[in-house]
Regions:
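Alpha-helical transmembrane bundles and membrane-interface segments of multipass inner-membrane proteins
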Residues: 1-198
């Protein structure tokens, strides 16, 4: 499944970007990078786009969960395995559909690595208790809907963006996915009806 190269690329890009933000020190490989102080923010395009280093123990886009850290991590593992298996089952489907799954899988694995290993790698907590590194701070639009207000979008990372793009691809092109599967059945039914009438 060549589409898995997209998944691998997303995971690598996501982890490299997080190491550059948080910093990494691997003496035996001669790798040492300081990173940014937690909470620091650097403007890229004025106030519209900033690099803001935050960590969260919860879900995507800096959304925290009060309890159930282990449950969330285990659910992420199960979901990643499920998506990979589903992608294998759908290996003969339309490329765009498989691409959307590959993007979602890459993002899921990227954040899963943070949750499973970062606590141990950085000496901050035990296995499965790591925090997700977020840093893309963009002011896309304000939200004011049914009492919910958001003046600035949640801080996110490459993995979050990959999952979101994959889901949007599925939503936007869902009709074409369904039509492609239904077309052979419709053609077969029409052919049968024609033969019967003859």
């Amino acid at each position: 499944m060549k589409v898995l190269f997209v998944t691998i690329f997303i995971v690598i890009a996501d982890q490299i970007s997080k190491f550059m933000i948080k910093g990494i020190d691997i003496p035996f490989l001669g790798i040492s990078f300081q990173g940014m102080p937690l909470g620091n923010s650097i403007p890229v395009f004025g106030d519209f786009l900033r690099i803001t280093f935050i960590e969260n123990p919860g879900m995507a886009f800096g959304i925290e969960v009060v309890d159930g850290k282990i449950f969330l991590t285990m659910f992420s593992i199960a979901a990643s395995i499920g998506i990979l298996f589903y992608l294998y089952l759908m290996r003969s489907e339309k490329l765009l559909f498989r691409l959307s799954l590959a993007l979602i899988l890459g993002g899921a694995i990227g954040n899963l690595i943070d949750r499973v290993f970062y606590g141990v790698i950085y000496g901050e907590s035990s296995l499965f208790h790591g925090k997700v590194v977020d840093f893309i701070d963009a002011d896309f639009f304000n939200i004011d809907f049914l009492g919910f207000q958001l003046s600035r979008f949640w801080v996110f990372n490459i993995a979050d963006a990959s999952v979101s793009i994959g889901v949007l691809l599925m939503l936007f092109f869902h009709r074409s996915f369904v039509d492609q599967k239904e077309l052979p059945a419709i053609e077969s039914k029409s052919s049968t009806e024609v033969n019967t009438s003859i």
